[in-house]
Amino acid sequence: MTSKLKVLQVIPKLGYGGAETGCYDLAHFLGENDCLSCIVTSGGELVRFINKKKVKLIKLPVQSKNPILILFNAIALVFIILFNNISIVHVRSRAPAWSCLLATKITRRKFVTTFHGTYNFKNSVKKFYNSVMVRSSLIIAGSNFIFLHVNRNYSKYLNVKKRFLVIFRGINVDYFESSTISESEENQQLKDWGLDKSKK
């Protein structure tokens, strides 16, 4: 059976932040739903939890802002995209976004970015560097605040050909379902936090 989608996510380091856990969760969701799911990262705490049967993990120095390494990563990504027949490249950070932009231009694959925060831009050079996050064909803002921030500060890089939308961060409601926690676990947690059960 052929995969429905072939998605490559690129993230500097797979730690415990919002962008990182979002990447991790999406990678496993895709892998569990008959899609080819790949992550390119330099490493991080979450790497050891990746289910290698569901998600293909490739390590590259994508955390680096060094222009030579950005170019090296772009060339490596071209080979990864072609070898795995990737259809969508999704990135959540600026330095690897430049590598992904180059790689998707060469391979003509769909390029998606998620704008998670308000990047510092004290001068036009920094603003240009940040602008890579709005140079994709689909731009995702993590909140209404970020959506307004991007429209206000990067409007010259936006055009009608680009889709720009808000996708709010979600949680797995099955995992956080209160009925899955035993009364003894709940009591222990309340005790650990110094909370009174009668006041909840």
Question: What kind of feature is each model-predicted range?
Answer:
Residues 91-97, 115:
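Short His-centered aromatic/hydrophobic patch
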Residues 45-46, 95-96, 145-147:
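Alpha-helix capping/helix-boundary segments
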Residues 154-155, 177-195:
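A short helix/loop element that forms part of the nucleotide-sugar donor recognition site in Leloir-type
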Residues 5, 9-17, 21-68, 156-163:
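N-terminal strand-loop element at the rim of the active site
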Residues 40-42, 90-91, 141-142:
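Short beta-strand scaffold positions
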Residues 136-166, 171-178:
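A short, active-site helix/loop in glycosyltransferases that binds the activated sugar's phosphate group
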Residues 105, 111-142, 148, 158:
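A conserved, positively charged/aromatic
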Residues 8, 196-200:
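Conserved donor-binding/catalytic core segment of Leloir-type glycosyltransferases
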